[in-house]
UniProtKB/Swiss-Prot annotation:
Pfam families: Na_H_Exchanger, NEXCaM_BD. It is a multi-pass membrane protein. This is Sodium/hydrogen exchanger 2. Residues 740-751 have a biased composition (Low complexity). Belongs to the monovalent cation:proton antiporter 1 (CPA1) transporter (TC 2.A.36) family. In colonic crypts activated by low pHi, hyperosmolarity, and an increase in intracellular cAMP levels. Interacts with CHP1 and CHP2. Keywords: Antiport, Cell membrane, Ion transport, Membrane, Sodium, Sodium transport, Transmembrane, Transmembrane helix, Transport. Residues 647-661, 771-782, 798-814 have a biased composition (Basic and acidic residues). Expressed in the colonic epithelium predominantly in the cryptal region. Maximally expressed in the luminal membrane near the crypt base and in the middle of the crypt (at protein level). Expressed in gastric epithelium (at protein level). The chain crosses the membrane at residues 108-128, 139-159, 170-190, 210-230, 238-258, 279-299, 309-329, 362-382, 393-413, 431-451, 460-480. The gene is Slc9a2.
Length: 814
């Protein structure tokens, strides 16, 4: 096949996919999306009861006529819903791949903006072909299926310590700030509606307050999609993200409260107090349900060590169960799934295996990425249609009031909260927090959820909400990166914390806790220390099993150590049987057993001070995971093990050499067995041992006597061997250099012969050793003057030095 055929085969799947998607939308005007998102129960009823083969009747025949077996059939309605859902997910994934093929595009335009543009393009194509409104996103589908994976991913990988350290500021912005924006926008819009020239007099105060509550919701999906790309510092990121996560619960509560007030004919004082009580019940109840199911999930994973396959399943089941349970009781599902995810991250992670933990991370990232992509695409698709009503005054003033009240709320509330913060928020931080108030899918879903019977101007609310969403996502989302660079806002530090830094941080935590305890101040350090003690004493013992799973690196290290111990025992390097002499001196000692309290204390000390294998995720990223540090840890552990093996082998070899190479047992290997040494050498050996420093006790003496290192083997003539030894005896510091030959001061240099040799060898000494060998140990100083005329032996067993790893034979290199 030529190049043209190859290119055609590559382009064919994409073209067929687009043609198939468009043909399905044209052939089925209602669309599976309409049945799935707009009329899901009817679609489920139709798909769950397919026509049986017996009831299928061919066209043009009566029920009594016999039908023949067809060769090829097409039953698209039977697979319509899952088929189109698969195509939409595939299209969204291909769109994300296409965006990231050009690396500079996601840095200029956020991914959420590109996905909305794709949705607008598809919605325009569907609207132009069918001349009908494209299928809109049903709110139940958004709240029950698309939103939970995103919130679960955000809560599971949220840095818990910065979140709780800034919890007061986050709660202040989320609760008081949302009330500020909702009431301010609602009252301001009601004032605009009182102007008769705008034609908005039919919109009441409660309807404006309801619209203000839903339009003031800062969306975590939009915030994550934008803020993860600009890499602001961790404190600023956690403030904006935490506010967007918590104010959703406040927004939903206010939305339901004002919606109920709008449907009432008369509002009494009891209803107002009931609404305030409902506000606290919804938020606190959702948190309690999430924590409870998180504890149950951790307790369940204590018993999954024999069935590792189902460990990731419990994480997703319990988290989704917390969300739908909270929604069933009309509590905050977002708060429930966030609390459940943070609880499971602390306890479930300790029980599951490393492979299960990796599966949980990747599957959670995949679900959140797909859900986020579908949300933004459906926002673009649902925008195109006929369900809009335009009013310049209402739309423009809504956008202006959203920006004004957001900025005023951040600046006013920050001035109050800075009185209680150790590190106050600067003007740049306040500006970025106000600028990062992005609206998104939650506002879009809530405005579509309004009943048309109670709100006759629903289309106007939809149009105004879409304008605010598109302005914040496109204009603010695109310009926030250059604005952060222009203001020189502190960025996040991607450098991983070193061990010394972590130790010092823990040390300062304990110091600050002690200072707060002495001063009687109950700060966050005090409460963190109290919770840690309670956690170690009760919760961890109940929720985490004792034999915690270890990393594969630890398992490998354990196997290597066991193998090394077995090899040492088999080769006899470790003697497990004591000698009879040692048994005579052995005293029976009773070993006291440790109490359970002492064992717990030892475990606590080891758990605090030992090297931790699994590293926690310090920074959050939407689509990518942090680099795995197992390779670096494996390298570090293997280096430590090799070092320990070298130390053990060095000690064993040195001790064996010391026992074998003592001065009393050393002999010349070149001589026959049982051959006695000359008397003078034996006297010299006795003198060296008589000094009280034998080679066994003092290695330097043994080395001086018998450490005959390799040297140039030149056999001296008999007539000047004695004089040459006298030259060796002289000290090197009294020598002078003559050319390349060292001559003692009392000896004049002899003339050289033609062949380069010396004419009077008795008056000149040529060193037989190199400079390094001569000045290394000073072995020649200990030789005697009377050397036998025989040449020195070639192979000699030398006395070993502790820690010296040189060879034992004389012909080895030093």
């Amino acid at each position: 096949m030529g190049p043209r055929g190859t290119a055609h085969s590559v382009r064919a799947p994409l073209s067929w996919l687009l043609l198939l998607l468009l043909s399905l939308q044209v052939a089925v005007p209602a669309g599976a999306l309409a049945e799935t998102l707009l009329d899901a129960p009817r679609a489920r009823g139709a798909s769950s009861n397919p026509p049986s083969p017996a009831s299928v009747v061919a066209p043009g025949t009566t029920p009594f006529e016999e039908s023949r077996l067809p060769v090829f059939t097409l039953d698209y309605p039977h697979v319509q819903i899952p088929f189109e859902i698969t195509l939409w997910i595939l299209l969204a994934s291909l769109a994300k791949i296409g965006f990231h093929l050009y690396h500079k595009l996601p840095t200029i335009v956020p991914e959420s903006c590109l996905l909305i543009m794709v949705g607008l393009l598809l919605g325009g194509i569907i609207f132009g072909v069918d001349e009908k409104s494209p299928p809109a996103m049903k709110t139940d589908v958004f709240f029950l299926y698309l939103l939970p994976p995103i919130v679960l991913d955000a809560g599971y990988f949220m840095p818990t310590r910065p979140f709780f350290e800034n919890f007061g500021t986050i709660f202040w912005y989320a609760v008081v700030g949302t009330l500020w924006n909702s009431i301010g926008i609602g009252v301001s819009l009601f004032g605009i509606c009182q102007i008769e020239a705008f034609g908005l007099s039919d919109i009441t105060l409660l309807q404006n307050l309801l619209f203000g509550s839903l339009i003031s919701a800062v969306d975590p999906v939009a915030v994550l999609a934008v803020f993860e790309n600009i890499h602001v510092n961790e404190q600023l990121y956690i403030l904006v993200f935490g506010e967007s996560l918590l104010n959703d619960a406040v927004t939903v509560v206010l939305y339901n409260l004002f919606k109920s007030f709008c449907q009432m004919k008369t509002i009494q004082t009891v209803d107002v107090f009931a609404g305030i009580a409902n506000f606290f019940v919804v938020g606190i109840g959702g948190v309690l349900i999430g924590i409870l199911l998180g504890f149950i999930a951790a307790f369940t994973t204590r018993f999954t060590h024999n069935i590792r396959v189902i460990e990731p399943l419990f994480v997703f089941l319990y988290s989704y169960l917390s969300y739908i349970t909270a929604e069933m009781f009309h509590l905050s599902g977002i708060m429930a799934i966030t609390a459940c995810a943070m609880t499971m991250n602390k306890y479930v992670e300790e029980n599951v295996s490393q492979k299960s933990y990796t599966t949980i991370k990747y599957f959670m990232k995949m679900l959140s990425s797909v859900s986020e992509t579908l949300i933004f695409i459906f926002m673009g698709v649902s925008t195109v249609g006929k369900n809009h009503e335009w009013n310049w005054a209402f739309v423009c003033f809504t956008l202006a009031f959203c920006l004004i009240w957001r900025a005023l709320g951040v600046f006013v509330l920050t001035q109050v909260i800075n009185w209680f913060r150790t590190i106050p928020l600067t003007f740049k931080d306040q500006f970025i927090i106000a600028y990062g108030g992005l609206r998104g899918a939650i506002c879009f879903a809530l405005v579509f959820l309004l009943p048309a019977t109670v709100f006759p101007r629903k289309k106007l609310f939809i149009t105004a909400a879409i304008v605010v969403i598109f302005f914040t996502v496109f204009i603010l989302g695109i310009t926030i990166r250059p604005l952060v660079e222009f203001l020189d806002v502190k960025r996040s530090n991607k450098k991983q914390q070193a061990v010394s830094e972590e130790i010092h941080c823990r040390f300062f935590d304990h110091v600050k806790t002690g200072i707060e305890d002495v001063c009687g101040h109950w700060g966050h350090n005090f409460w963190r220390d109290k919770f840690k003690k309670f956690d170690d004493k009760y919760l961890r013992k109940l929720l985490i099993r004792e034999n915690q799973p270890k990393s594969s690196i630890v398992s490998l290290y354990k196997k290597l150590e066991i193998k090394h111990a077995i090899e040492m025992a088999e080769t006899g390097m470790i003697s497990t049987v004591p000698s009879f002499a040692s048994l005579n001196d052995c005293r029976e000692e009773k070993i006291r057993k440790l109490t359970p309290g002492e064992m717990d204390e030892i475990r606590e000390i080891l758990s605090r001070n030992l090297y931790q294998i699994r590293q926690r995720t310090l920074s959050y990223n939407r689509h990518n995971l942090t680099a795995d540090t197992s390779e670096r840890q494996a390298k570090e552990i293997l280096i430590r093990r090799r070092h320990s093996l070298r130390e053990s082998l060095r000690k064993d070899n040195s001790s064996n050499r010391e026992r074998r190479a003592s001065t009393s047992t050393s002999r010349y290997l070149s001589l026959p067995k049982n051959t006695k040494l000359p008397e003078k050498l034996q006297k010299k050996k006795k003198v060296s041992n008589a000094d009280g420093n034998s080679s066994d006790s003092d290695p330097d003496v043994g080395t001086t006597v018998l450490n005959l290192q390799p040297r140039t083997r030149r056999f001296l003539p008999d007539q000047f061997s004695k004089k040459a030894s006298q030259a060796y005896k002289m000290e090197w510091k009294n020598e002078v250099d003559v050319g390349s030959v060292r001559v003692p001061p009392s000896v004049s240099p002899a003339p050289r012969s033609k062949d380069g040799g010396t004419q009077t060898p008795g008056l000149l000494r040529q060193p037989l050793l190199s400079k390094d060998q001569r000045f290394g140990r000073g072995r020649e100083d200990s030789l005697t003057e009377d050397v036998p005329p025989k040449p020195p032996p070639r192979l000699v067993r030398r006395a070993s030095e502790p820690g010296n790893r040189k060879g034992r034979l004389g012909n080895e290199k030093p």
